[in-house]
């Protein structure tokens, strides 16, 4: 199979979908790997390293896309890439289609087969290809939140850990999944006063045991969220409904009631965000103000730490990429139900229910395509 690895062109996106180790694995199995010139530089991987691993380097994105039976990416295609999508090609990347109807329509029109990292789901309902990026985004959230809390950044001027004799910042984490727990880990490590909310009390028991009393757990409902958010210096939104648009849990009116200079970091922004006033921002302009509060809504947070996140991502995507290359998409999906759940679009049909619901497009059951 001919595998294409284009350079990521989203704003300040420095990750790459395949490392030299991955290229070596695929080429040693008899596949051809085509990497766009400079694709790895943001992650400090040179073209020479790919060449040494058996890949071929091509100068232009058009050439790379044209060569590939399968395209490996990190982020969803953006508008300038839509014309490169074509029937008979398999695209394996993060898609987050519930929050992006134009992309969904472009994929449907192209006839391509699109498999989304974020909807691959194991029998225990965990999301193996989303988890490492949730870990990275979760651990980044208190870091960017702390920076945004500084007065020159527009924040309250609060040090997360306080100092002896001065109270620490109050950090509220909404959502006790992978991102939320990783956010709480770093916030606790900074010395902040941390509260975490989740609707699942069993999950809160696990978190309570894990942190041994170093944070407070709270059963999540609209009243509990309102009380916690009003008192918070930093709110981290980490709510995920697999494949679907995130629920809006913090209203505009509630933000107006918050302390001036408080900060809200929305990790759920790539699924539409979990604060009412959230809208996607970039690493170039990460924040904006709402009612004297600072919103940080960067949709590709892990892109800021590519040396970490490229390797974290490819560690988990490579086995699936190998299966797709070795068997072809149809056989690979029939052999692995978890990977089959990753299929979002095939030959003009939308096979993911939550995406169809969020975008108002027609749903074709997965079984009819496999």
Which residues does each PLM region occupy?
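Adenosine-phosphate binding glycine-rich loop
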Residues: 118-159, 269, 274-370
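Rossmann-like adenosine-cofactor binding region
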Residues: 209-292
């Amino acid at each position: 199979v001919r595998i294409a690895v284009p350079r990521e062109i989203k704003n300040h996106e420095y990750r790459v979908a395949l490392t030299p180790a991955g290229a070596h694995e695929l080429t040693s199995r008899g596949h051809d790997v085509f990497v766009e010139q400079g694709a790895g530089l943001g992650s400090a991987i040179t073209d020479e390293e790919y060449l040494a691993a058996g890949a071929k380097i091509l100068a232009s994105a058009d050439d790379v896309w044209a060569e590939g039976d399968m395209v490996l990416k990190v982020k969803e295609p953006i508008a300038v890439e839509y014309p490169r999508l074509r029937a008979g090609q398999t695209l394996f990347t993060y898609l987050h289609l519930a929050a992006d109807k134009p992309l969904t329509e472009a994929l449907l029109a192209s006839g391509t087969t699109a498999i989304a990292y974020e909807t691959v789901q194991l029998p225990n309902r965990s999301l193996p290809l989303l988890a490492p990026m949730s870990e990275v985004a979760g651990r980044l959230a208190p870091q960017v939140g702390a920076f945004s809390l500084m007065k020159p950044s527009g924040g309250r001027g609060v040090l997360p850990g306080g100092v002896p004799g001065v109270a620490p910042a109050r950090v509220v984490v909404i959502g006790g999944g992978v991102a939320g727990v990783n956010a709480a880990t770093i916030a606790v490590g900074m010395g902040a006063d941390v509260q975490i909310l989740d609707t699942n009390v069993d999950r809160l028991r696990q978190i309570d045991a894990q942190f041994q009393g170093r944070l407070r757990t709270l059963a999540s409902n609209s009243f509990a969220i309102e009380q916690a958010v009003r008192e918070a210096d930093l709110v981290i939104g980490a709510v995920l409904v697999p494949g679907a648009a995130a629920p809006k849990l913090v209203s505009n009116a509630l933000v107006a009631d918050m302390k001036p200079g408080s900060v809200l970091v929305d990790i759920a922004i790539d699924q539409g965000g979990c604060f009412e006033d959230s809208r996607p921002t970039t690493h170039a302009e990460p924040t904006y103000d709402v009612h004297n509060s600072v919103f940080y809504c960067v949709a590709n947070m892990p892109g800021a730490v590519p040396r970490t996140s490229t390797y974290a991502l490819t560690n988990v995507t490579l086995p699936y990429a190998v299966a797709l290359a070795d068997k072809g998409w149809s056989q690979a999906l029939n052999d692995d139900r978890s990977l089959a759940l990753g299929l979002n679009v095939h030959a003009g049909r939308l096979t993911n229910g939550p995406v169809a619901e969020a975008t108002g497009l027609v749903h074709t059951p997965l079984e009819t395509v496999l």
